[in-house]
């Protein structure tokens, strides 16, 4: 007894003291909520005072002198640990594992000397192992030292993890896969935190960057763990207009007022109030906003909602760019000769993203003009349907009535009989000939008309879904008039006349329009579809593009024909890396590869169905967008056709690319099925092929093509200058 009293006097730390660490875990359902958790240091029972201090309530034996310097801090006393015992796990299925975890967490071992602070640290370490919901250390005096009895309460065996709220973006299978290795085992709070971080990473990987997982909010004795999930929701979307410097106010301190209607911007945003915020969706939304072509910069700010944690307002800072433009230039085409052109356009009419433009060109052989109105997305249409209306006027020399001419321009009058000339009068002779008079004017075709078109993506009513399929419906009407350059109407044309009057075979005199009329009225509707999986709409290297369409012409009078035009094309791109001339195709370590090259294939075909075919509606083969070794419409004029192209595109410098191509086309012998057989009379072959090479220069207005191609591997070469890729 004296030894025991002596030990107590030597270490007031122990005595009858009890040290405990009881984490405030959630209680079973229906239990009262626990009090706020105290620090571990405050969970130590009966912390004894310094033995040098008098007992509480007892006055000191001597009067304290005048204030004196504090004595040096005394070292904590240490006692000998005789034994460490873990209790509370007698019937636990993982007793051995948990006991080892508790022992491993403690620094105090039999034979060691420890202080009260060190013992408290051990208590905290046992709890920090994550296996226990309650930890208490009871020092018991013994003849050989202090016996430490560590009483623990193990966490329940994990059976299920629930998320609150239940309506989450996180799939149940992801939760199951995350915790499957832990089910049926004692819950470890450290492992639980690791699993929560895995779920947090899943949210981040899926773009839910505002989502937060906390808890556990409740751990039931049956092993059901509840975690709190705050996904982060959108409260609203606001549009804020900025100047070029990024300021919301002008020099006078007034708010910047934009031209664009706010709904033009917000309709491109898929994130709606109440929806879970997703960074990926917002990035796609920003791309769509840029894709309108109306804005030079878009700044995004997430504004937290006061008093509503987890809710944000998306603020879009918009910098508008000029929507009006005027441009002009000079050019050359076979149908117009040398021409001048002027274009006027406003791409944001009335701030509603409407596009209104006019194009006027006038050349040696005619001119054309049109006014086009486009609404890229009819307001409040969930299918993102677009609308376009066009009014046009043109007077051109159709190349189907022309033969090859290697000179820079055509003559307005043709005296050698190589092309069709207008017939001013004709007399039919009995011997299969006709006597014709002509002014040797080249045949011109004038068109005046209008059309409207609707395009609807097959997106299932989701305007933000990338739909590969699009449906096209259009209606149109036009009046077509064959004439000479003075504007006089003529119904017949002749080829081979070298004088006026002249006697020519009757088959060399043809009708220039349907029913040999001076005017034709064409009324039609067209149904079409497109399918695209291209990886880049401007310079694709991978994917497919399919276009199908049928246009039905309906008679509205004696000189109005009825027929149908069917046409389709298919394009396929295969990414390759054959030539590595461009340095981007040979990146150094750490550099990003930039080597856009592809092997491209295109097949197109079409046919006219019916007998009322106006000659000017025939299919033309040859030209910069057809078989490139031939001039426009110089290969064939047919009722049916097919073309095929194989092309290899590769970069050379940053803005210069090269191409090697092979084109081929045929009319399937249908030149004679066109009334008057203009292609046959002009000696057009009807089929041919063309290998060639080219350079493509990337410019602000698009790619410019400079190509050289030969006709059927002969010495006849043609040079072509075009805008944009052929396909």
Model regions and ranges:
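Bacterial N-terminal signal peptides that target proteins for export
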Residues: 1-12
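Periplasmic polypeptide-binding modules associated with outer-membrane biogenesis and secretion
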Residues: 4, 27-334, 343, 357-377, ...
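N-terminal signal peptide c-region/cleavage motif recognized by signal peptidases
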Residues: 21-23
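A generic structural motif
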Residues: 90, 473, 552-556, 710-712
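Gram-negative/organellar outer-membrane beta-barrel architecture
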Residues: 164, 168-177, 185, 190, ...
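Short glycine/proline-enriched loop/turn "hinge" motifs that connect secondary-structure elements
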Residues: 381-382, 537-541, 696
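C-terminal outer-membrane beta-barrel translocator/porin domains of Gram-negative envelope proteins
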Residues: 488-670, 675-677
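C-terminal beta-signal and terminal closure region of outer-membrane beta-barrel proteins
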Residues: 673-727
């Amino acid at each position: 007894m004296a030894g025991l009293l002596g030990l107590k006097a030597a270490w007031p730390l122990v005595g009858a003291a009890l040290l405990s660490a009881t984490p405030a875990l959630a209680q079973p359902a229906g239990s009262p909520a626990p009090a706020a958790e105290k620090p571990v240091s405050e969970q130590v029972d009966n912390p004894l005072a310094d033995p040098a201090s008098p007992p509480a309530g007892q006055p000191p034996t001597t009067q304290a002198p005048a204030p004196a310097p504090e004595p040096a801090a005394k070292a904590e006393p240490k006692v000998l640990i005789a034994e460490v015992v873990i209790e509370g796990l007698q019937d636990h299925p993982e007793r051995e594992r948990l006991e080892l975890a508790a022992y491993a967490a403690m620094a105090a071992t039999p034979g060691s000397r420890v202080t009260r602070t060190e013992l408290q640290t051990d208590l905290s370490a046992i709890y920090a192992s994550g296996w226990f919901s309650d930890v208490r250390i009871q020092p018991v005096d013994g003849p050989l030292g202090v016996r430490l009895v560590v009483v623990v309460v193990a966490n329940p065996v994990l059976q299920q993890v629930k998320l609150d709220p239940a309506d989450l973006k996180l799939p149940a299978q992801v939760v199951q896969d995350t915790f499957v290795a832990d089910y049926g085992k004692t819950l470890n709070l450290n492992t639980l935190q690791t699993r929560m971080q895995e779920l947090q990473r899943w949210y981040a990987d899926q773009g839910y960057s505002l989502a937060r997982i906390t808890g556990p909010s409740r751990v039931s004795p049956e092993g059901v763990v509840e975690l709190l999930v705050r996904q982060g929701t959108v409260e609203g979307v606001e549009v804020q207009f900025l100047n070029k410097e990024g300021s919301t106010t002008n020099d006078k301190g007034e708010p910047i007022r934009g031209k664009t209607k706010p709904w033009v911007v917000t309709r491109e945003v898929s994130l709606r109030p109440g929806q879970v915020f997703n960074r990926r969706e917002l990035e796609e939304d920003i791309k769509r906003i840029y894709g309108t072509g109306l804005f030079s910069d878009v700044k995004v700010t997430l504004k937290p909602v006061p008093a509503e944690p987890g809710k944000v307002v998306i603020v879009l800072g918009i910098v508008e760019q000029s929507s009006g433009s005027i441009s002009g230039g000079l050019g050359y085409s076979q149908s117009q000769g040398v021409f001048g052109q002027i274009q006027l356009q406003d791409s944001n009419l009335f701030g509603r993203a409407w596009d209104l433009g006019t194009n006027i060109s006038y050349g040696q052989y005619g001119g054309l003009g049109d006014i086009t109105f486009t609404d890229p997305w009819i307001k409040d249409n969930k299918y993102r349907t677009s609308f376009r209306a066009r009014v046009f006027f043109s007077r051109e020399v159709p190349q189907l009535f022309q033969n090859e001419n290697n000179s820079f321009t055509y003559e307005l009058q043709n005296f050698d009989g190589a092309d069709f000339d207008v017939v001013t009068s004709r007399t039919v002779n009995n011997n299969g000939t006709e006597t014709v008079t002509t002014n040797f004017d080249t045949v011109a075709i004038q068109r005046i008309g209008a059309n409207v078109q609707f395009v609807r993506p097959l997106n299932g009513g989701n305007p933000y879904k990338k739909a590969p399929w699009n449906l096209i419906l259009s209606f149109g009407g036009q009046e077509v008039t064959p004439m000479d350059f003075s504007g006089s109407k003529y119904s017949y044309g002749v080829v081979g006349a070298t004088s006026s009057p002249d006697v020519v075979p009757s088959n060399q005199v043809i009708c220039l329009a349907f029913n040999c009329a001076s005017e034709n009225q064409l009324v039609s509707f067209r149904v079409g579809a497109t399918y695209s999986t291209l990886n880049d709409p401007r310079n694709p290297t991978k994917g497919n593009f399919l276009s199908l369409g049928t246009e039905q012409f309906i008679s509205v009078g004696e000189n109005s024909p009825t027929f149908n035009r069917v046409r389709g094309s298919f394009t396929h791109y295969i990414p390759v890396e054959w030539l590595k001339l461009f340095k981007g195709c040979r990146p150094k370590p750490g550099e990003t590869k930039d080597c856009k090259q592809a092997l491209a294939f295109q097949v197109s075909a079409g046919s006219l169905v019916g007998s009322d075919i106006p000659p000017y509606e025939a299919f033309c083969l040859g030209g910069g967008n057809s078989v490139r070794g031939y001039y426009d419409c110089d290969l064939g004029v047919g009722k049916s056709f097919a073309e095929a192209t194989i092309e290899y595109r590769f970069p050379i410098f940053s803005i210069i690319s090269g191409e090697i191509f092979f084109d081929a086309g045929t009319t399937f012998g249908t030149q004679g099925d066109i009334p008057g057989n203009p292609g046959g009379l002009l000696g057009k072959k009807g089929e041919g092929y063309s290998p060639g090479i080219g350079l493509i220069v990337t410019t602000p207005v698009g790619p410019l093509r400079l190509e050289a191609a030969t006709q059927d591997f002969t010495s006849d070469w043609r040079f072509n200058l075009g805008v944009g890729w052929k396909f």
